[in-house]
């Protein structure tokens, strides 16, 4: 049973690594304050799936 648990964990880690390889994330140089709405809107204009804040800088991914 212990072997299958380790195998499951390794498989999950590999899948996460593969998934994050295909998700492009870039900083677009926009400040997130006063709200994240501007960040999300600018990311969608640039054809990215979503926008998120890291610190006070907007990043786009997808």
Curated annotation (Swiss-Prot):
Keywords: Disulfide bond, Neurotoxin, Secreted, Signal, Toxin. Expressed by the venom gland. It is found in: Secreted. Transmembrane segments: none annotated. Residues 1-25 form the signal peptide. Disulfide bonds join 32-53, 39-58, 43-60. One of its GO terms (cellular component) is extracellular region. One of its GO terms (molecular function) is toxin activity. Neurotoxin. Decreases the action potential of myelinated nerves in mice and frogs. This is Venom protein 51.1. It comes from Lychas mucronatus. The lineage of its organism: Eukaryota, Metazoa, Ecdysozoa, Arthropoda, Chelicerata.
């Amino acid at each position: 049973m212990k072997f299958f648990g380790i195998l499951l964990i390794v498989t999950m880690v590999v899948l996460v690594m593969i998934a994050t390889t295909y998700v492009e994330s870039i900083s677009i140089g926009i400040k997130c304050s006063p709200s994240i709405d501007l960040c999300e809107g600018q990311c969608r204009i640039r054809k990215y799936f979503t926008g998120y804040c890291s610190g006070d800088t907007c990043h786009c991914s997808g």
